[in-house]
Amino acid sequence: MSLAAVLIVKNEAHHLRACLETLRWADEIVVLDAGSVDTTCDIAREFTGKVMVNADWQGFGVQRQRAEAMVESDWILMVDADERVTPELRDSIQAAVARGEPAIHTLPRLSWCFGDFIRHSGWYPDRVARLYPRGKAGYDNALVHEKLQNPGGLPVKALEGDLLHYTYRDLRHY
């Protein structure tokens, strides 16, 4: 079984390299850019030949669908540029893919906000459904707050290891 790490991006040069460094182990990396004017695409091309640009923005859901359509691997791991896969999460993902049992897997996301990780007030674990078999699940058409759809009723399983989310650097970014 093979795995594609998939990202949709726009002007993420400040985050992208650190994110992609944590995904080098993936069989395939797919980056769909929404029309960046910084060095996002140049950085992405250092890690993969599968960098496409589609600036016809119709929302996060549609953009994720477009990125999913570029995947050749058996499994999809959807990651945002401001996220990092820890070694523990990588091991958990690889074990799930090796088992090959169709399921949607949730990842425990740990958010960094204003200089520290937030582990309270419902912020952790912020479980996000991001690992799924290609063609058996996919994103809705939502403009924002897109959701992974599970039309076949696949089981939902929880993985171990954190997905680090470097969200708000300071109040200006909040």
Short names for language-model regions:
Residues 2, 27-28:
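Residues at the starts of beta-strands that form the adenosine-phosphate
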Residues 61-68, 75, 86-174:
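Catalytic-site signature of metal-activated, phosphate-bearing donor transferases
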Residues 41-70:
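Conserved donor nucleotide-binding strand/loop of the catalytic core
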Residues 25, 47-48, 127, 152:
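Short, structured coil segments at secondary-structure junctions
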Residues 14-17, 38-47, 88-89:
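Acidic helix N-cap motif at the loop->helix transition within catalytic regions
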Residues 22, 33-43, 56, 80:
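A conserved acidic beta->alpha catalytic loop
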Residues 1-22:
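N-proximal low-complexity "stem/linker" segments adjacent to membrane-targeting elements
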